[in-house]
Amino acid sequence: MNLLIMGLPGAGKGTQAAKIVEEFGVAHISTGDMFRAAMANQTEMGRLAKSFIDKGELVPDEVTNGIVKERLAESDIAEKGFLLDGYPRTIEQAHALDETLKALDIKLDGVINIEVNPESLVERLSGRFICRSCGSTYHKVFNPTKVEGTCDVCGGHEFFQREDDKPETVKRRLDVNIAQGEPIIAHYRELGLVSDIQGNQDIDDVFADVKKAIAAIK
């Protein structure tokens, strides 16, 4: 069984990916792991990727696509199947993946799309704040301090928010992800591969829906 998992940052995609891998025994292929392995093993594409990263440059699509192809050609994929996580990120990469799968004679069985309302994601992702004295991390909704305005760990009263966690920054990041993701989802929807999963639920309820979707695919 060969699957792709998609979802916006904060939608719980990583959590569900880990559960799918544990439950179904497929190979978990994440972009970060692929890059690290390719560079550590000094594959042709790994060496190319490292040359760009060492210069502080973005790795071009051709190299990223090549690393994915190298990974999908490994023997465990034929044995176990895969869950691809974090790729494709653009419609161009999606088309490149189509070509790679065709060249390797691999069939993509389904796309699990974790859907969460972007407004609730802004709240989820921008709620983090940090104690200036000791660095302890809290969340306005999910992990507040026991006493408002006082750090549980050191008793400090000064907190700050990282630039990346501010609502306007989070919203901009989500807007970019939505703009990139919509044509990819549309592409796979045309192929009849997408299963939409409501992500605004308890983690176990989300996974119950994921399992139902996978059972329908199988």
Swiss-Prot record:
The gene is adk. This is Adenylate kinase. It comes from Streptococcus thermophilus (strain ATCC BAA-250 / LMG 18311). Its main location: cytoplasm. It is found in: Cytoplasm. One of its GO terms (molecular function) is zinc ion binding. PROSITE patterns: ADENYLATE_KINASE. Residues 30-59 are annotated as: NMP. Keywords: ATP-binding, Cytoplasm, Kinase, Metal-binding, Nucleotide biosynthesis, Nucleotide-binding, Transferase, Zinc. ATP binds at G10, A11, G12, K13, G14, T15, R128, T137, Y138, Q201. Catalyzes the reversible transfer of the terminal phosphate group between ATP and AMP. Plays an important role in cellular energy homeostasis and in adenine nucleotide metabolism. GO terms for cellular component: cytoplasm. It catalyses: AMP + ATP = 2 ADP. NCBIfam families: adk, PRK00279.1-2, PRK00279.1-3, PRK00279.1-4. Consists of three domains, a large central CORE domain and two small peripheral domains, NMPbind and LID, which undergo movements during catalysis. The LID domain closes over the site of phosphoryl transfer upon ATP binding. Assembling and dissambling the active center during each catalytic cycle provides an effective means to prevent ATP hydrolysis. Some bacteria have evolved a zinc-coordinating structure that stabilizes the LID domain. InterPro entries: Adenyl_kin_sub, Adenylat/UMP-CMP_kin, Adenylat_kinase_CS, Adenylate_kinase_lid-dom, P-loop_NTPase. Residues 127-165 are annotated as: LID. Belongs to the adenylate kinase family. Its EC number is 2.7.4.3. AMP binds at T31, R36, E57, L58, V59, G86, Y87, P88, R89, Q93, R162, R173.
